[in-house]
Amino acid sequence: MANSTGKAPPDERRKGLAFLDELRQFHHSRGSPFKKIPAVGGKELDLHGLYTRVTTLGGFAKVSEKNQWGEIVEEFNFPRSCSNAAFALKQYYLRYLEKYEKVHHFGEDDDEVPPGNPKPQLPIGAIPSSYNYQQHSVSDYLRQSYGLSMDFNSPNDYNKLVLSLLSGLPNEVDFAINVCTLLSNESKHVMQLEKDPKIITLLLANAGVFDDTLGSFSTVFGEEWKEKTDRDFVKFWKDIVDDNEVRDLISDRNKSHEGTSGEWIWESLFHPPRKLGINDIEGQRVLQIAVILRNLSFEEGNVKLLAANRTCLRFLLLSAHSHFISLRQLGLDTLGNIAAELLLDPVDFKTTHLMFHTVTKCLMSRDRFLKMRGMEILGNLCKAEDNGVLICEYVDQDSYREIICHLTLPDVLLVISTLEVLYMLTEMGDVACTKIAKVEKSIDMLVCLVSMDIQMFGPDALAAVKLIEHPSSSHQMLSEIRPQAIEQVQTQTHVASAPASRAVVAQHVAPPPGIVEIDSEKFACQWLNAHFEVNPDCSVSRAEMYSEYLSTCSKLARGGILTSTGFYKCLRTVFPNHTVKRVEDSSSNGQAHIHVVGVKRRAIPLPIQMYYQQQPVSTSVVRVDSVPDVSPAPSPAGIPHGSQTIGNHFQRTPVANQSSNLTATQMSFPVQGVHTVAQTVSRIPQNPSPHTHQQQNAPVTVIQSKAPIPCEVVKATVIQNSIPQTGVPVSIAVGGGPPQSSVVQNHSTGPQPVTVVNSQTLLHHPSVIPQQSPLHTVVPGQIPSGTPVTVIQQAVPQSHMFGRVQNIPACTSTVSQGQQLITTSPQPVQTSSQQTSAGSQSQDTVIIAPPQYVTTSASNIVSATSVQNFQVATGQMVTIAGVPSPQASRVGFQNIAPKPLPSQQVSSTVVQQPIQQPQQPTQQSVVIVSQPAQQGQTYAPAIHQIVLANPAALPAGQTVQLTGQPNITPSSSPSPVPATNNQVPTAMSSSSTPQSQGPPPTVSQMLSVKRQQQQQHSPAPPPQQVQVQVQQPQQVQMQVQPQQSNAGVGQPASGESSLIKQLLLPKRGPSTPGGKLILPAPQIPPPNNARAPSPQVVYQVASNQAAGFGVQGQTPAQQLLVGQQNVQLVPSAMPPSGGVQTVPISNLQILPGPLISNSPATIFQGTSGNQVTITVVPNTSFAPATVSQGNATQLIAPAGITMSGTQTGVGLPVQTLPATQASPAGQSSCTTATPPFKGDKIICQKEEEAKEATGLHVHERKIEVMENPSCRRGATNTSNGDTKENEMHVGSLLNGRKYSDSSLPPSNSGKIQSETNQCSLISNGPSLELGENGASGKQNSEQIDMQDIKSDLRKPLVNGICDFDKGDGSHLSKNIPNHKTSNHVGNGEISPMEPQGTLDITQQDTAKGDQLERISNGPVLTLGGSSVSSIQEASNAATQQFSGTDLLNGPLASSLNSDVPQQRPSVVVSPHSTTSVIQGHQIIAVPDSGSKVSHSPALSSDVRSTNGTAECKTVKRPAEDTDRETVAGIPNKVGVRIVTISDPNNAGCSATMVAVPAGADPSTVAKVAIESAVQQKQQHPPTYVQNVVPQNTPMPPSPAVQVQGQPNSSQPSPFSGSSQPGDPMRKPGQNFMCLWQSCKKWFQTPSQVFYHAATEHGGKDVYPGQCLWEGCEPFQRQRFSFITHLQDKHCSKDALLAGLKQDEPGQAGSQKSSTKQPTVGGTSSTPRAQKAIVNHPSAALMALRRGSRNLVFRDFTDEKEGPITKHIRLTAALILKNIGKYSECGRRLLKRHENNLSVLAISNMEASSTLAKCLYELNFTVQSKEQEKDSEMLQ
């Protein structure tokens, strides 16, 4: 097959041969086969080249038409003298290639008549030249009719092999063996032995191995052929097998065994050994057969046949014992493969005996390969259960010992093989497990392997290992499968058609279960219909159509692709009227193309359905369409069934701008639940009738279950009520919860559509909100099972446009399970309350999402003049106040409580009172969401409130917000409202007279709203007057949120901007306490400027004399700027001795300050008179600013401060509470419970969850780690050291301090109830956990404690250093345990800044006797680095002073550490100003970033009182931000702390680990503490220590630095002892010293210091009972608590370095301060007696949990476990589990390692669950045996 160019290259030749084969097959199928290729000039004609050439010129027809055959002839081998060469070439092409071209190139149908009836006029070459044997076949029917035999011998290819092997002809045998070798290779056509099992026997016979039965081939092959072929296989086996036991398997029938042994000796003497190799004919033949058997042993179907063939087993045993290396390797490999299917005969059979002999010999060998193969064979033998008895009996103890010895070798493959066989052996039962356990140190080695890392084997350990990962179908991404919705385009709504998903999927992934690919023909027809349409004037190239189809199929990785013939059939089906024409293409040398006429390409392809749903049963679509008066055709979003089971995909049904009298919203979200699928498609046409004035509402009650819903389908019902004067409450119970009915009457006029979308998946909201439709996104918070969520959307008057929502782009966010996250993109939302014509319609959309995941695309709130905007986050209800309507609107909100009693639903009543008439177009609205006190509630509900005021202006008397008490209906209600336990209808008239409405409501919890940013300078708000109406206890809440302009600050990145990121993790346990709010200011790193966060001021007034107070802007040119998050202005008056009486506010003015910039010289101006001016500095990178102060008390503080007091008579007690709980004074008991909220906090079981859920990094927010998720009754334990106490509960004191909410009974404030008739508690606001213990007012002395404000002093201290978040300053209180804001007082230490009068209820006598209420270390401590806090007590802002209150005498200075970046703003303290005045004293706190608080016990002498000035030294944070990421992988289950104490000198030897699970009683955990570490301390590093903080250990409070115009009167500091100079034995490189009392030893690393201190000073026998570290508070601690404290406070790198720096100056300062002890106020100079500190019950767990973030559990937690490490650990754990399950001896040995295994069982290792099962086996088996013994004794 040569052409004119000479010899073809190999590729061309290969292609030519393939073409000829295909051509022959084509002609054969048509009945016109050819055998010879035509020859031209003595050479074969290159048909492939001819076909290629002709087709490139356009095909046969085109070449003939242009008469180009003469040109083609020149390229082939026609003689030059041949005149008819062109004609001959054309005939050859016509005979061989024309039909092939027609079918394969042009894709036309083969219209040839089948060859059964050939036409005589065909050319001679078309007549079939082969004989038709089919004419002789007799049908089965005829055979049966005539009695012919029906039993046919169907010959197959295997019969040919068998016959070839049987023939004995060398030629045939070689051919058959070669074929078997090829077939045995892993390929598409694997040899199937079951088709003819005789092949195995014949192959073995050709290798000289025969069966012992009579029918064997030994006679033929062994004797007769040996003479003819000169091949003696018997001699071959005898030569290569030396083991006498195995030699008996050699079949030698000629000689008796008695005489052979002697002859063998002489043969070995006189004959040289066999030279094995290529020249050894027998050896090569045996090797060939061994290769075939080995290859076959990898196929499951062949393994059973090979294992059942005893001759094959004999051959393998002979091969395994031969000294022919290649043969031995092949034999052992094959034995290992078939051993799993090998059923051993009884041991008296020789093969069984030899099998164990082979295994033992391999195990005892010194050859690594033999050892591994022996273990593999033994392990696979264990897989057959019938072999268990034999294996347990005949595998001796020496073999077990040899196997276990392999574990000590640093060889990965050997260790893996050993673990595999040990695991298989332990599955056999108690005999094997006991034998393993009896091997010395076997259990110890296995326990060590559980925590082994692959790095222990060295860097070259993986060189010999090749990892082949098989991706499982469960891990395949489903994101690429996007079923497309086929929208129904409606002309009325003008919805443009847009495919919802991509037409081409980039990556092929298997569809999820239940999704089946549609068949090829249907897909091709859909594809044609989607891409082409009928057009009689157009044509499309048919080849291009097919090529595009092939391209689409390849991109989609479709399985079935139609051939061109099938494709053209589909083309005729889709376009039956098309025609075909030939079109000349001038660009390709005049080549003609076949075009399809009458078909045109679509401009926009239609969507294609690629999959269909097999299980459409579980889906339900609820569509409620209510069309009042005028009913246009609804436009449902058609969604194929396939979309309802695909998670994380959404259907985008665009909603265009409707006409003026039609508003429609379409949303469709495919939802994937846990077990069910809910699909909600809602479309609600708006009532276009302008003349109808209807009173209606559309309440929707959705009762959800937080647990997975196995059966029910989650449904969302959309109700559009068009019937006048009817309320339509709808209850949908999902998950079995009892539906709670909600009856609400709405008096606004106009229809109100409500769209409720309920889903359990991530909702992506695209830009689907029409411009005239405000979007109210209401996401229910943590909803326990059966808790109703009621959302009532108030209708708006028809004549007023409610607002617009513009430009809401899609925003995608990934949220972990159980967390809500609402992110917004920074597009403006403008909600205008302007008036429109009566014909305008409004529409609100309420989206109710379940507590799984929600991503709501809303936008930043940008306010201009007369703009009202609000957005509501999780669990919040929204009511718009100020919308004018003829009647007072009344809306009841049934909010969410965590599993309350069925009859006690938390209710939140928001009363709307429009004050101005609709004719006032400039009226502004205030959105207030509050929550009332709950009556008879078991614990504080998880209710969060949003208080959003109009940022631009607040007209006088605009907003009235009241929180009512259940079962109270106000007298001024315009219409009767049913009052139930669940709903509190409350109405307010526009008058300012107070109304009697029950007990005081709770202090409002504010949900920080995303900072509002403006691109332009907005005009300053006009003077605004807010009138607040007061209820019976005169408790009124008014929250104003001014809008600040952010001039010059660009929009931040939209990916980081968020409205509200809130996380309410589901807590475990039946009595889940109230959740906390996350109030993060979104962390957006601005490029070069600081952004202005959203200010918020909370004014809380308790007054029965004045009905309101004024908030007036001073000048229009200024704007009220109040801090980042939450600022509560609490001017607190001294409560009189009588009942509930407070002083009115005369004129409380908010001074609008100028816009705060980053410049350090920002000036804040104060006003004169009795005014309190708050100016909050929200900037991120503030230098210490210069503050010019006016006459007034001026507080310049970042967001989150509590300022108490202006003057007597102007003060506003936050909440005046009557004494409760049967107080002797007889006050009425108040059962209101305040939800124990801290504003800016997260409660979660794991910090990683919080980080992942909120999308924030570690430095972006506080995360409060919930330690004991299942607390009793409402006592919420947090790791922050705050006890949240509820009504009727005197909360136990956590770490010496209480969290007293403002509605707490005074019995919790540290005073005796008898002496406290009334306690004025000051709450610092929800975003801070400052001095929540508040001011404990004493009735007799009329004194109020100093309110010590410590915004960041209560944060968990990590490594003993308080350091701030490295962030943008948008958040104040960050509470992540290993945070830079962490200064933790929960480990048994009490915060020295604590007012000691509120420390403990047991302090009543002391507090009553000497009334010594002290503020430790001064009243002001600022930790934040970006603000200057200045408090000047003016004459009218007096600091209350009584005999026991001590204030700072001078400025409290914080020296700024230069090496720490500036951090977030902190808070400043304002003393109460009631009685006496300290003139001219200024307290300036210059916060430093990451600075160590002066009271931290981690440093030796932090606070030195020198001339009345307290200095705060700064310490660098031990772990920088870069280090924080490395701590994230610590094995941390929920609520578990794992502590590691490892010896740094020999790191790999042992580690001391302890873990305390969440929910465990600390006293119980302490009993399980392991003492082995102390016992083994002398020999090697301690193994495992369990650190538990004691539950109730009395601890003395911290010393207080008192500066009150007198010398400092503080008790001797524990760090006042002189610190000796460093150890003279210090060696080079030793930079860290143990600062333990009189130790002074030097070490190289902090870990060495920690190990030394934990073992030498914290040992069981030497621990003195308290920490004697220099500068540490002398608190009594249990030893396990001390170890945690030691690691947290003292043994970090920075803490040690700081201790060294402050060692010498610390001595002088502490001694100096300790010598100053004059009297204070005439009291004696003796130090105050230490008070006992009552630890919270969960203090131990929280202390353990808190430090877990700092541990570097590097052995197996830093990096993710590799596959080999995971395999080794998991296999070792499985072995231990089996040993613990079956072996009594093993259990006894495992008991010693129970503590170690307990730690590992709660880690994040892959083997942790297996280890937990192992521990269960240890305990359960013992208990079950004890029970069996007891039952036997009873019988």
From Swiss-Prot:
It comes from Homo sapiens. Residues 1301-1314, 1491-1509, 1573-1592, 1708-1728 have a biased composition (Polar residues). GO terms for cellular component: chromatin; kinetochore; nuclear matrix; nucleoplasm; nucleus; plasma membrane; RSC-type complex; SWI/SNF complex. Residues 13-105 form the ARID domain. Keywords: Acetylation, Chromatin regulator, Disease variant, DNA-binding, Intellectual disability, Isopeptide bond, Metal-binding, Nucleus, Phosphoprotein, Transcription, Transcription regulation, Ubl conjugation, Zinc, Zinc-finger. A motif (LXXLL) lies at residues 313-317. The keyword Hydrolase does not apply. This is AT-rich interactive domain-containing protein 2. It is linked to Coffin-Siris syndrome 6: A form of Coffin-Siris syndrome, a congenital multiple malformation syndrome with broad phenotypic and genetic variability. Cardinal features are intellectual disability, coarse facial features, hypertrichosis, and hypoplastic or absent fifth digit nails or phalanges. Additional features include malformations of the cardiac, gastrointestinal, genitourinary, and/or central nervous systems. Sucking/feeding difficulties, poor growth, ophthalmologic abnormalities, hearing impairment, and spinal anomalies are common findings. The gene is ARID2.
